[in-house]
Amino acid sequence: MASAAAGASICIKSASCSPLAPGRISSLRSVSLPVSRKSFPSLRSSKGSFARVSCQAKPETVAKVCRIVKKQLALPDDSEVNGLSKFSALGADSLDTVEIVMGLEEEFGISVEEESAQSIQTVQDAADLIEKLMEKKGH
């Protein structure tokens, strides 16, 4: 269990994350938070949901997934698709999502289990899963 003295601070360091939506912080290197004896800093967004940090997938994997999603959904080239893009917000229904997963399987030479496929909601989710499966496969 960690403890902190009054006036101490915690420093969180991170490598660059994959591309994020405009207005979001990317390439975060460190964050310092003041800590007192009676309270511990909270990493919450203004909406009250916990902040989500996902840096597993390489930026090039996220970019490739973005291209595949655009192609499968027949989106214009200038459409904004990034790691935070939800398939549903891009107009994808469940059949479109299955087709996206099939396109990803073909492109990356992987096999996605049905249970894993159902958990994919965003481009980042797909890219993270691909990296995980590629790592298991030994690529």
UniProtKB/Swiss-Prot annotation:
The keyword Lipid biosynthesis applies. Carrier of the growing fatty acid chain in fatty acid biosynthesis. It is found in: Plastid, Chloroplast. GO terms for molecular function: acyl carrier activity; phosphopantetheine binding. The gene is ACL1. The keyword Translocase does not apply. It holds the Pfam family PP-binding. Keywords: Chloroplast, Fatty acid biosynthesis, Fatty acid metabolism, Lipid biosynthesis, Lipid metabolism, Phosphopantetheine, Phosphoprotein, Plastid, Transit peptide. Belongs to the acyl carrier protein (ACP) family. This is Acyl carrier protein 4, chloroplastic. GO terms for cellular component: chloroplast. It comes from the Eukaryota. Gene3D superfamilies: ACP-like. Its main location: plastid. Residues 59-134 form the Carrier domain. The modification O-(pantetheine 4'-phosphoryl)serine is found at residue 94. Transmembrane segments: none annotated. 4'-phosphopantetheine is transferred from CoA to a specific serine of apo-ACP by acpS. This modification is essential for activity because fatty acids are bound in thioester linkage to the sulfhydryl of the prosthetic group. SUPFAM superfamilies: ACP-like (SSF47336). Residues 1-55 form a transit peptide. InterPro entries: ACP, ACP-like_sf, ACP_chloroplastic, PKS_PP-bd, PP-bd_ACP, Ppantetheine_attach_site. Pathway: Lipid metabolism; fatty acid biosynthesis. It comes from Cuphea lanceolata.
